[in-house]
């Protein structure tokens, strides 16, 4: 489907990535949050270049090696390419359609985890032309059902400027500081 243009399965990209080193605490915390009943979506917050994306790959590697709790075994992590998803969307409806199709194909899959780098861009994303749209509202049903788990990443600055303003997102994501 269309959505495969906007997501990459990290589990299938591992051979192109170096193993994660020195992030065991953050990785354990991420796994712990993903296994909880509530507020089970980790949000990695740290300065640019500290390795937030590397953590998502590190988790995919642990899943592939079977070194995760039963609840996460067999999970697949997909990275959302927000840039290409927003590219060429002249109308907010275009962006909404793309996001919906991604979410739909992920819900059909068991144990999908969607990694969204620079997740603050979803808050107020698609404010194209005069109609403003908050894409985080489109994620809320999925966040509530819990059939798709999310991992977000952002910087402290963007968190404070955008993410912290969305009470619904703050309520569903658990902050994990990446130093």
Annotate each predicted stretch with a short phrase:
Residues 2, 18-30:
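N-terminal pre-P-loop "Q-motif" helix
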Residues 143-161:
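Sensor-1/coupling segment of RecA-like P-loop NTPase cores
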Residues 117-119:
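Walker B catalytic acidic pair
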Residues 78-107:
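Short glycine-rich substrate-engagement loop in P-loop NTPases that contacts/grips substrate
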Residues 31-72:
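Walker A/P-loop
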Residues 100-109, 134-149:
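Substrate-engagement module of ASCE P-loop NTPases
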Residues 174-179:
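Conserved AAA+ ATPase "SRH/arginine-finger" region at the nucleotide-binding site
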């Amino acid at each position: 489907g269309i959505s495969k243009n906007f997501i990459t399965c990290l589990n299938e990209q591992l051979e192109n990535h170096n193993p994660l080193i020195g992030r065991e605490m953050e990785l354990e915390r991420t796994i712990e949050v993903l296994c909880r009943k509530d507020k089970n979506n980790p949000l990695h917050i740290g300065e640019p270049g500290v390795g937030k994306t590397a953590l998502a790959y590190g988790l995919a590697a642990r899943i592939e090696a079977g070194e995760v709790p039963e609840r996460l075994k067999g999970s697949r992590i997909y990275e959302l390419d927000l840039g290409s998803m927003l590219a060429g969307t002249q109308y907010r409806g275009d962006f909404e359609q793309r996001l919906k199709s991604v979410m739909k194909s992920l819900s059909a899959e068991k144990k999908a985890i969607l990694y969204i780098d620079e997740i603050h861009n979803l808050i107020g994303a698609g404010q194209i032309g005069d109609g403003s749209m908050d894409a985080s509202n489109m994620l809320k049903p999925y966040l509530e059902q819990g059939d798709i788990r999310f991992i977000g990443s952002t910087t402290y600055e963007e968190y404070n400027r955008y993410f912290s303003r969305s009470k619904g997102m703050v309520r569903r994501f658990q902050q994990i500081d990446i130093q």
